[in-house]
């Protein structure tokens, strides 16, 4: 905490010639807080960044992601919907909102519609493909989910895709394959919270 306070003080002490410099200083501080896992403080500070450029969808998207990390799913949803209202083809917002709904197990048909719309704009994106697989799993379409998630993982060996693919395999009774995928995920990032939570919830030990 002492080092964090020191680093924040250094950022704040940097000279700023105008509004753009001031915003960049705030963004540097937000990034520092994010890296230290101080998501609530990062979210609050990002709100100040957004207030300086409220029409900047990328800044609002960053605030939405921090709202999610800070445990504010409704606020995340509000921010993402505000982006989509302004820019309906902002596929990152469509995907993030669809995935959030799917992950919480709410409004699953809307989640699927949002993710399919995101895929129209970015059909090769493995993370959006992952979201589609996850919503299909939540809808109970496990075999379809498996095929989609295998495609996503083939495109991108990502730890969170591994967590989802492993869970679908586990639910289908393919436990050895699930454990193998999770081991791959742990090799990519053994500290990932999504994978750790999945393993704990399922009582699995790769």
Residue ranges and their predicted role:
Residues 1-206:
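Alpha-solenoid helical repeat scaffolds
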């Amino acid at each position: 905490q002492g080092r964090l306070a020191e680093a924040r003080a250094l950022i704040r002490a940097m000279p700023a010639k105008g509004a753009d410099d001031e915003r960049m200083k705030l963004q540097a501080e937000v990034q520092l807080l994010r890296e230290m896992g101080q998501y609530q403080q990062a979210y609050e500070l990002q709100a100040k960044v957004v207030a300086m450029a409220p029409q900047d969808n990328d800044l609002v998207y960053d605030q939405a992601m921090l709202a999610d990390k800070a445990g504010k799913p409704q606020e995340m949803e509000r921010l993402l919907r505000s982006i989509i209202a302004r820019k309906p083809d902002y596929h990152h917002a469509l995907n993030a909102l669809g995935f959030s709904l799917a992950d919480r197990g709410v409004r699953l048909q809307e989640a699927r519609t949002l993710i399919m719309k995101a895929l129209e704009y970015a059909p090769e994106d493995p993370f959006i493909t992952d979201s589609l697989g996850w919503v299909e799993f939540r809808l109970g379409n496990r075999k379809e989910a498996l095929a989609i998630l295998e495609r996503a993982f083939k495109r991108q060996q990502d730890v969170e895709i591994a967590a989802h693919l492993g869970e679908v395999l586990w639910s289908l009774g393919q436990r050895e394959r699930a454990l193998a995928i999770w081991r791959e995920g742990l090799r990519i990032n053994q500290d990932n919270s999504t994978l750790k939570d999945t393993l704990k919830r399922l009582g699995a030990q790769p």
